Regions:
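Sec-dependent N-terminal signal peptides
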Residues: 3-13
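Structured catalytic-domain cores with a bias toward divalent-metal coordination
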Residues: 2-3, 17-464
Length: 464
């Protein structure tokens, strides 16, 4: 399936980070108002839910029907590992002041729920302990939430899927047939929100959904379990709900705890500035220095999943994957040139062509040919200002300059010589995210940038 998905970004005004939450579509509507809407990350300290939701966009292919997924509702809270930077987002659906920082976010979520095509909504949570209908101990009792399928009532007035209890019970049985450990058994939890006048649950997202005559289910995984196990149980439940809705799918990994762990922890890709630069993050170094940043373009980027963000902080930028820090970038500000976006060079004696922002695997060596009015800088290979026309082996590389701790991945950068003024041919990428709150550049920084060669783009080479 496509690695970088087409994503609609809904902008919310968030204190400090101002991160947007994203919404992706997977599959094609059959015009039967049978789309399933799935939310993750409504609380930022629940990684099982937001990782499961993210995988539905990056690693699933819906072959019949359609899902809409918003995996990172409280994205700023996810990055900060906070339940909610502006209070509990899941308690703002009954009423919210227009002055609340989450107001626009809540309105956008409601708009998604009220889409005519949406007939079922699934909200993913991680909760402490294990819900049990009867008291066993402090972590296994009726007041706990973990490993439960939660409904607000047994039945609703809806044209599709009115029997919430029956559907949720089927899901519980389905999950329990694939437990990693019998102690993880799921149970149905009916909060009887309206019947009992539960003042907290009356404010929640799922109650807003059923109040608008649509089926809603919350799936809880236990915070006492590792993240991959939580996501595993979420996906087991989601797949059963999708089957209930007649939605068919395939996925790129085996649905086991190990398969989910591998999918969550696979190599990340971040593409910067109209996809000119690829950062392939496979156990990356904690700091990457002298990363070209443009003074004449917007600071945009794309990622291989919707939980990864590039965030400005002082004089640097850092990359975060959900709750987890990846690396910090220290920029070198330059003018960028739009003259071309691919190069042809030799890899292990064979000619290959690669686009900027891509990675090429190398067994033995590579050689970048001389290019008129262009110089080449191979980061970690120190043989002069222009390093084209030289056969490069892994043994020639200084491993401390690799992107990864294993010393295998290196940047190869291309520059238009100052004063050449090559014809500009490329167009800007309009489907990218923006790095917010980058500091304004001083006159000296701009002057320095305009005295240097212009950055064209870069590729990565990965030695075996």
């Amino acid at each position: 399936m496509k690695f970088f998905l087409t994503i609609l970004f809904f902008i919310t005004s968030i204190f400090a980070l101002e991160l947007d939450f994203s919404v992706g579509e997977n599959g094609k509507s059959l015009d039967d108002n049978n789309t399933v809407l799935i939310f993750g990350g409504i609380q930022g300290d629940e990684p099982g839910g937001f990782h499961a939701a993210s995988l539905l966009l990056s690693d699933y292919n819906i072959t019949k029907g359609k899902i809409i997924v918003a995996p990172n509702l409280a994205f700023d809270s996810i990055i900060k590992r906070s339940r909610g930077n502006n209070g509990d987002l899941n308690r703002k659906f009954a009423s919210i002041s227009p002055k609340d920082p989450d107001y626009k976010r809540v309105q956008r979520i409601k708009e998604l729920i009220l889409l005519p095509e949406v007939s079922m909504v699934i909200n993913l949570h991680d909760g402490w302990g294990f819900y049990k209908p009867t008291y066993i101990d402090a972590m296994q009792n009726p007041k706990r939430w973990g490993n439960s399928s939660v409904i607000d009532t047994s039945e609703i007035n809806a044209s599709k899927y009115p029997d919430l209890e029956n559907i949720a019970t089927q899901t519980v049985n389905s999950v329990n047939s694939s437990l990693a450990d019998p102690k993880h058994a799921y149970h149905l939890k009916n909060t009887k929100t309206q019947e009992l006048g539960d003042t907290e649950m009356l404010k929640a997202l799922t109650y807003f959904v059923i109040s608008n005559h649509k089926a809603a289910f919350a799936n809880e995984a236990s915070k006492n379990l590792p993240v991959n196990l939580r996501a595993y149980y979420h996906l087991l439940a989601i797949e059963n709900y999708l089957k209930t809705a007649g939605i068919e799918f395939s996925r790129d990994f085996e649905l086991t705890p190990q398969g989910v762990d591998k999918a969550i922890n696979k190599e990340l890709e971040v593409k910067l500035f109209d996809d000119r630069i690829l950062l392939s993050l496979k156990n990356p170094r904690k700091v990457i220095n002298y990363v070209p940043f443009p003074v004449n373009k917007e600071l945009n980027y794309n990622t291989s999943n919707e939980l990864t963000a590039v965030i400005a902080e002082g004089n640097s930028f850092y990359i975060q994957y959900g709750n987890r820090f990846q690396t910090r970038l220290y920029p070198e500000y330059l003018e960028f040139s739009d003259a071309f976006n691919e190069i042809t060079f030799q890899v292990d004696g064979n000619e290959t062509t690669a686009s900027f922002g891509s990675k090429v695997k190398v067994k033995e060596n590579f050689l970048i040919p001389k290019i008129a009015n262009v110089r080449v800088n191979i980061i970690g290979f120190d043989l002069g200002k222009d390093e084209s026309g030289i056969l490069v082996h892994k043994k020639n590389m200084q491993t401390q300059y690799s992107l990864d701790m294993a010393g295998k991945i290196y940047r190869v950068e291309f520059y238009e010589l100052r004063g050449v003024n090559l014809q500009q041919l490329l167009e800007a990428n309009t489907n990218s995210k923006l790095i917010k709150n980058a500091k304004n550049l001083g006159l000296n920084t701009l002057k320095m940038a305009r005295s240097k060669d212009k950055f064209l783009g870069s590729i990565l080479v990965e030695f075996e």
